[in-house]
Amino acid sequence: MPRIREKGKEMKKRPLAYITAHWSDNEYENTERAAKFCRAVYDAGFSPICPLLIHSLFLRDEVPQEHKDGLDMARDYLRRSNVLVVCGSSVDEAVKNDIAMAERLRITATTLDGILTVKGQGRRDK
């Protein structure tokens, strides 16, 4: 992992990990799941980026232009990421689109369980 220096300290630079999952219609449940996924990815040594958590704070998805802007921003986050992390046990069209975009951008796509296994942390509790 690359290292950076900050005021005389050497620190590890965490790779950016874009978090995607099949989200339900329940906003509260999605927020809870997304936060748990992000924590697991963070604990594995990555800097998680989860549009669902970020955008819900300031965008109104029911406003068409804000919905479109959210999609555009999410694609920009993915372009800047080092890895796409697919979380959860099911895949929907949005996740398939994220995987296809990552492939086009030559960004590694993996699962949360894959990251945790590689990092030696075993499987995460679901």
Predicted segments with their positions:
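Catalytic phosphate/metal-binding cores of nucleic-acid and nucleotide-processing enzymes, i.e., regions
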Residues: 1-126
